[in-house]
């Protein structure tokens, strides 16, 4: 089974969010399960020089973008059993700052999607993929290009596509002129059954309409986006293709996230030494952020973008109530100025209760996972979520809203059976969130029970192998002759 991943970010090369973790980790697990996996990425200027020095030039070629013919080159790097190809074009990808949000993103990612398909004509015959796995709106037009422009050609006739929705909120929506000018498509495709949506070209919808199979990053998110509340106006399209949509839970790379080996911690630990290890990390974290060093109060962590999707409005709403609790809170993140200012102010007026760090620091984030007793994730929606998986591995019990991947991974504590690996609340409601925090504090003071919960959480297995097996089964379903 030969699988190509077409994506716009992947660890360790370039990362802006959880997509990079998936594309950096899932191919490795697939390779371990016997698949031949390649990952195709843009060759951004932001990729570190150490990786660029390892890249090998393969060929240059011409890529059609609407009526234009644009230059491109392909470089290759092999790592951990996976081949990474990099599409090189200085105009589109050698830019300072962020990799998304440019005025010509419609053109940049149309170019990238065409380039991936044009590569197939140039690689050796034995490297032609059986399946191309596309990720989020940036590669949404690739399945459309394949079906409309390429499927009739030799080498392309048997290729199938999978399109994964990582976050339906971001859809890649552009003016109608993009259709012919950049995509080379006639107006017969600008319909409700095609890639038009609300009078605009929608790259996400292109993937939903034209891919052979569609996946989401958790089973619950798959069900949620069929409903208007979560469907971001695309629920009719998803309902129409419901039989082809499945939820496959993301995993976590425990080589990257493990308290046993994490170099950012003051003391490493495992499930057998968790009491001593977390106590040392908690004291160091309290001291680092200026909180009173007190082992007897529960310490809550929050590491996220400060935006409403992450439930930050709920946290802001209950902030005065948190001041009254016998607990401490650490907030790490950046986002909307209103929330940044609010939490900075809170840490100024109540330095005994709240510590805030506006921005992002990888090492500090890891120390929060290790030093906190519980971890806050009150998300409005969460396609999968990675932080709750990390926090469990580090013995910080997640407090989550029951949505998307949070519902699929966090089993709420049952005080009668002592089952569970965290705490949860159902409705997007500040009072329910506060009640969940209070339940956690109450349980924290029952030391044997709290230790049992921590041990349960740390022993959960959300590794990528299970996800890889599900994806392999999906690939074989649509390309049964590939093996």
Swiss-Prot record:
Gene3D superfamilies: Glycogen Phosphorylase B
Database matches in HAMAP family: Glycogen_synth
Function field: Synthesizes alpha-1,4-glucan chains using ADP-glucose.
Residue numbers binding ADP-alpha-D-glucose: 15
One Pfam family recorded for the sequence: Glycos_transf_1
GO biological process: glycogen biosynthetic process
InterPro entries associated with the record: Glyco_trans_1 (IPR001296), GS/SS (IPR011835), Starch_synth_cat_dom (IPR013534)
Catalytic function, reaction form: [(1->4)-alpha-D-glucosyl](n) + ADP-alpha-D-glucose = [(1->4)-alpha-D-glucosyl](n+1) + ADP + H(+)
Organism superkingdom: Bacteria
The UniProt record lists the keyword Chloroplast: no
Keywords: Glycogen biosynthesis, Glycosyltransferase, Transferase
Biological or metabolic pathway of the protein: Glycan biosynthesis; glycogen biosynthesis
Protein name, entry field: Glycogen synthase
Keyword Transferase included in the entry's annotation: yes
Family: Belongs to the glycosyltransferase 1 family. Bacterial/plant glycogen synthase subfamily.
GO function term, MF aspect, one: alpha-1,4-glucan glucosyltransferase (ADP-glucose donor) activity
Source organism: Exiguobacterium sibiricum (strain DSM 17290 / CCUG 55495 / CIP 109462 / JCM 13490 / 255-15)
Record-listed E.C. numbers: 2.4.1.21
